[in-house]
């Protein structure tokens, strides 16, 4: 995949959608949010969300843990170099979008849903699934970032429900 073409849009034209009703509201309130999301996707192609349920404390904890990891020397970070499940550290220049001519100029630490080795999705050799790897000398990385991942996963599930409702499908269609 090559880099996408972009267009300019005034920031004030990007809708900000309050997603709290997806978590706490009535089904009618959730439907109203879903319709706003659909309208934004169709008319603008992008939107911001607020009241998504990821607390500032969880965000700050993840940020501090990531800073602690990325401030370490490359040799140390390579102790958790990316594995066959695509979990772990990638150094500058090691990531490149498919068919792109240039590499990404960033470091990454990739983790995901932590699944045991005997989980059916892992034993079926699904790519990107499996046990995460964390640096043994830095247990605060996992403790700092995994709650952010879990909160983001829940937010994503709420958004998938809204996408389904917005196109008049049962809300669990994409879950």
Enumerate the language-model features and the residues they cover.
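Peripheral, non-catalytic segments flanking oxidoreductase cores
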Residues: 1-175
